[in-house]
């Protein structure tokens, strides 16, 4: 690669998004585990295996411990960082949570095997990312801050670039 150029890094999302989008996040941990080592050997930048609806689905529909799932995946992925999708101030839920709850959840996520938090706010309100970014940095995790793309008169390239720069200033390791 030419000097000064950055490589494109690929995150595999099949362990979270594929079954979240296709079958309402109903894959059990036992269905997921057999493929983890194969995915780990491919050379991805990260495996997004947790977050989004996985936590809720484990508890409500699969009768599984989501923390145990995370630890089992991490145990099998020896080479590839584990990534999660984190809804900013909403954590993995459907409402805002207090800062101390966000901080504690981030701390426990990293302690149980998450290396990279892909943090987003569906409305692109960076204030809803601030606490999670600070907590992730405090725990030495990788902050992948997210800009949600859509089209409208308000959503311009300039606004997306401005937001990306704000996220960089807030401590994002990647966008």
Where are these regions (language model features)?
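Alpha/beta enzyme core
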Residues: 5-10, 24-54, 59-81, 90-175
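Charged, compositionally biased N-terminal leader segments and the immediate start
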Residues: 1-2
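Acidic, glycine/proline-rich low-complexity segments that act as flexible tails and inter-domain linkers
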Residues: 16-20, 25
